[in-house]
Amino acid sequence: MTVTAALLLVALIAPLAAALATLGWPEPAAPGHPARTGARWRRALVLAASAATAACTLALAALVQRGDTTTLSLLQLTPHTWLTLRVDAVGALYAATAAVLWLLALVYAVGYLRGPRLGRVHAALMVCLAAAIGVAYAGNLLTFFVFYELLSVLTYVLVVHDETPAALAAGLKYIVYVLFGGSLVLAGVLLTFALAGDLSFTVDGVFAAGAPANALRVAFACFALGFGVKAALMPLHGWVADAHPAAPAPCSALLSGVLVAAGGFGLVRVCFEVFGVDTLRSLGVMPWLGAAAAVTIVVAALLALQQDDLKRRLAYSTVSQMGYVTLALALLGPVATAGALVHLVHHAFLKGTLFFCAGSFAHATGRRGMASLAGLAARTPVTAAAFTLATLGMIGVPPLSGFVSKWWLGVGMLESSAPATLVLLLLGALLAAGYLLPVVFALYFAKVVTRPLEVAPKPGVAARSFEVEHRASLLAAISVAAALTLVLGVAASAAGFPLALARQAAATFFGGG
């Protein structure tokens, strides 16, 4: 077995093994109870498994840049169909992003998650991490669908973790949406097999030159709508604004940075490795996808402006930002595609930082409304500074990571002879400033209002009063995530960084690598 194959297996198996092990530990009990010790070991185990997966994915990303790739067959389903894993540039990019953000979310969860059901959520987090790795390294369309659906369905556990009426309602809406989207993706898979007899990922696409155009358009529509549900493409975004506030803050960060991004990643795989650039151009379907993306960018940002709940505001921001990714893919240009891929990565860490901070603000005040943020920077200076840094990154201020991805998006728009789309890029940045800068202003300059120091209790959890910046795990996750928004911008062109992998993947899709 090669080193690449071994790293691939460890990245997938480590979180699955941790999930099985965590289910055997009892739930936390009163201080001094043996279950308390078990809970600590469980947290240590999931952190170790997540760290191992992150290390493996980063090593695989480095190997891919050197030209090392591998294909690993896991299970034969039919004489011609295997569950297969494959390491390539675009998969390595998504896998490393998911694994690193997952590790940060688990570190944050150490200081954030309390109460019952921790074993359940830890197990779900580990299986979801393994599913995300499977999505990233899927070697064919069937393997992708299996892991994609596993990730979609098990995320329900994260959404309903608190088991409040709002969380259960959000979970129901979420599962209805993703099952609908998954059924459309399955229809696309079946149509692809019927038309091509092949579910491989191939740069030139799997369809023969004489394939019926209208049937191909139907297949593409199934994929676009199915993945559009996960990618929050309007009007398929309805689950996002309820699921993000309902989920605990570390899970909200993963919803935004990994789960929603999985929809965008699915579009990348289907566009460039199922249909291929030439087929998509001949079908004439991409302008329709671009139009939906344009509406998503603007309307979601306008909806974000209207939200008083900070997590809902951030959720609509995610919808708007994913519109950039879809719009860039619709342009079918190498630079625009590289910009879309790097924006998937940079947005994940920017939005992860913002959701971590939002969770800490809510813990410090017991509320999520804008009024509760007034003057909070005095009590949470590090968290407020991290939120400010990520806000500037989301707007696209240099030299932060958001500027780098939006620069490449802009250059790609010009290269693709679509300068009008630059208006959307600039308008989106202005609207992002409109819905995020007021939060920063409130943190530093708004008049302090009466604010409870005790967190509003959740069912089954005793109310706690604490200063969030006294919890090292919260500060560590927030600080590292915020630092990444700076490092990924300042050192964007360095070897091994996301931009290099994004350009490598785009060059492969368009025949330059």
Residues of each region from the PLM?
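Cytoplasmic/organellar membrane-interface segments at the starts of transmembrane helices
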Residues: 247-248, 380-382, 436-513
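Short helix-coil transition/hinge motifs at the ends and kinks of transmembrane helices
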Residues: 29-36, 275-284, 452-455, 462-463
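Transmembrane helix-loop-helix hairpins at membrane boundaries of multipass inner-membrane proteins
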Residues: 2-9, 17-123, 198-205, 498-511
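Short phosphate-coordinating micro-motif centered on Lys-Gly-acidic
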Residues: 149
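Hydrophobic transmembrane alpha-helices and their helix-loop junctions in integral membrane proteins
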Residues: 104-114, 118-119, 127-142, 154-443
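Hydrophobic alpha-helical transmembrane segments of integral membrane proteins
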Residues: 11-12, 22, 231, 395, ...
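Hydrophobic alpha-helical membrane-insertion segments
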Residues: 48-62, 179-187, 256, 390, ...
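Alpha-helical transmembrane segments and their helix-start/interface "positive-inside/aromatic belt" motifs
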Residues: 39-50, 169-179, 253, 380-384, ...
